[in-house]
Structures are given as structure tokens and as C-alpha cells.
Amino acid sequence: THSASSAASDVYKRQGKNEGLIPAGFAALDKLRIEAGLILFGNEFDGQQDPFEAGIGFAVPLKTKEEDFIGKEVLKERKANPQKKLVGLELIGKEAAGHGDCVHVGRSQVGVITSGCLSTTLNKNIALCRIDTQYSSEGTEVEVGKIDGHQKRIAAKVVGFPHFDPKKTRVRS
């Protein structure tokens, strides 16, 4: 018997072949998310960061008088003086950084990898990182610690964020 789902799959394969479509799973979707700099709960933020460190400060209504809430003044202060910032990293070599890998300058831990991948679109080894603001400038050289953070290090530098289409000029559909 031929089920509806297999018939749909046949149409997808037949029509998609002409358009260059290929089946892709969650790993491909996650790579695209990282390239685009899209944050994911549980990776880039988990409720332990303020909205500005988490990269969702745009959702906090600090400027309107109608939107008053407990903690508004504290959040204004946090926005003005952030402790951490979400940045992009480009790593040297082909070993991808993983969620939770530590980021160092010398012996000091200055950040943590939130997501990383070998980007097939950009042909680069990239990551998202929450880092102390003093090390968040583009071009800053850091090292990603593997194993215990000290035994093996991967050279990296802070780069523009998001990695892919940073000015959002691609057509949206």
C-alpha cells in the first residue's frame, strides 16, 4: 500500500529535485540558527541572564510610561552597564565548540560557548558565546577550552554577529 505520507514524500522529492531541495534534519536547522544568530532557550539563555545578556532586550519596554513593572529601574541599569554580551566567534581548525565549553584569555575564563558548529554555508568553524563585555570587541583573540579548559585550547576571535547576513539584506519569505 502507498500511504499519504509516502505520496507526499514522492512529490517533495520529485518537485524539490528541480529546485535543489534536499531532506534535512534538526542538525541542519541548528546550523542555520547559529549562522543567523538566532537564540535558543536552553543554549543562549536559560533564565539566569537578564534580557540584555540573553539577547532579547528589544522585548523589554523600558521607554514607555504605560508599561511600568517591578524591576524596571534595575533593568535600565543593567542595560546601561552590561556584564556579559552575546557575540559571534570564529574558531581556527575543524573541531567545533560545544555548548558549555569555556572561553579564555590567558588563564582567566571570560566566557562560555552557548552554541557552535562547522558551518557548511560559510565554510567556517563558528560559535555563539556569552562573554565579559571587556572582551566583546570584534577582533579580540580568545581560546576555547576543551576537556578541562586548560589541557586543550582552540584559537578563536570575536567576529560580527550574526555570522550570516548580518545586515538582514536577504529576501524574507
Regions found by a protein language model. Give the residues of each.
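Flexible, glycine/charged-enriched surface loops at secondary-structure junctions
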Residues: 18-31, 151-157
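Short, conserved secondary-structure transition motifs
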Residues: 25-44
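Structural signal for hydrophobic packing residues in well-ordered secondary-structure cores
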Residues: 13-20, 38, 42, 162
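Short acidic, glycine/serine/threonine-rich loops at helix termini
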Residues: 9-10, 45-46, 169-170
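Short, acidic Gly/Pro/Ser/Thr-rich loop/turn segments
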Residues: 6, 41, 96-97
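Single conserved hydrophobic/aromatic residue that forms the stacking wall/gate
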Residues: 1-8, 12
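Glycine-rich, small/acidic residue-mixed loop/short-helix segments
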Residues: 49, 53-173
